[in-house]
Amino acid sequence: MVSVSLSHHNLWPPESGSTAFRGFATAASVHACHHVSRHLRLDFHLRSSLKKLQHFSDDARMKFARYQRVFVFNGANFLKSRVDIRLSQSSPFVCFFNGGESRLNPRGGEEGSSNPETSKRNTVNGRRWTNVLLAINVIMYIAQIASDGKVLTWGAKINSLIERGQLWRLATASVLHANPMHLMINCYSLNSIGPTAESLGGPKRFLAVYLTSAVAKPILRVLGSAMSYWFNKAPSVGASGAIFGLVGSVAVFVIRHKQMVRGGNEDLMQIAQIIALNMAMGLMSRRIDNWGHIGGLLGGTAMTWLLGPQWKYEYTTRDGRRVFMDSAPIPLLLRWRNEQRRL
């Protein structure tokens, strides 16, 4: 995950003198992202392009049983499942989980046949917007190539121009990249963490976190303290701020559901190591925009804390279904508003 600061006089690849460091940064970033994809494993039967993600424990003593893999928010299935689920008629933020129709064998699998087409479709749906964002990054880079790499024209982050009213640069900078290696690192990182974040929060919350993090990245520099101007006056491009926001989003989810997740502390340690590694690389080179990384991380963390999900067990119905409530601040506020309307 690298966000590159560009010289005003050199808006294409960095000078050759930094080749050795760029090689180290590339290897370190790829290694860090590989650790993310290995350690953030979800038991939602969703796959990234690297491997099947399995994170939730198969331990029957967990508050979530093995078959409870679907979360519903306002009528939308955020995580796919093969079991029965019903949305509460009294509140759009209540989930009913029922595993009675899907028996589990001792090895952790389900008895009976499964539909390969359904499994494939669920896997694709679980990363649909990740694929869209990857395609946008590649298409925008092709457009840059066609225009001789003029990233300023396409919307690179330039503090002075943003302050003059070109606010669109807050968003467009996150889909631009300085060179092919920059694009490859960020696409690899997005492909590693994106499906996990999209599966945990669903497409709407995933996009909200990604876009907020992308915008929060330059805002921290433009509206922040004088130190941000001092350390990063140059234009910058890159999707790493938004990707850092997704990392923060996954961290918030793990923290909120630590009692339901086996190995949550280890996952948080891995996330902390990845963040620290990228921060260290930023300190070693002025061409890596640490302020963008910090801004994206804070933006994604804050948005996930507000939007959720934060699933809280409420009770078990007479027919054995467990009811979970999304108790994140905004879902709570919306539920309260809906209740007030019914009064």
Swiss-Prot record:
Deletion phenotype: Longer roots and increased number of lateral roots. No effect on the appearance of plants or time of flowering. Reduced fertility. Rbl10 and rbl11 double mutants have no visible phenotype.
GO cellular component, one term: chloroplast membrane
Class in the EC hierarchy, top level: hydrolase
Plastid in keyword set: yes
Locations listed in the record: Plastid, Chloroplast membrane
Transmembrane segments: 132-152, 167-185, 206-226, 235-255, 267-285, 291-311
InterPro entries: Peptidase_S54_rhomboid_dom, Rhomboid-like_sf, Rhomboid_protease_S54
Function (record text): Rhomboid-type serine protease that catalyzes intramembrane proteolysis. Required for correct root growth, floral development, fertility and photoprotection. May be involved in TIC22 processing during its import and in AOS accumulation in the chloroplast membrane.
Family label: Belongs to the peptidase S54 family.
Name of protein: RHOMBOID-like protein 10, chloroplastic
Native source species: Arabidopsis thaliana (Mouse-ear cress)
Lineage of the species this protein comes from: Eukaryota, Viridiplantae, Streptophyta, Embryophyta, Tracheophyta
Gene encoding the protein: RBL10
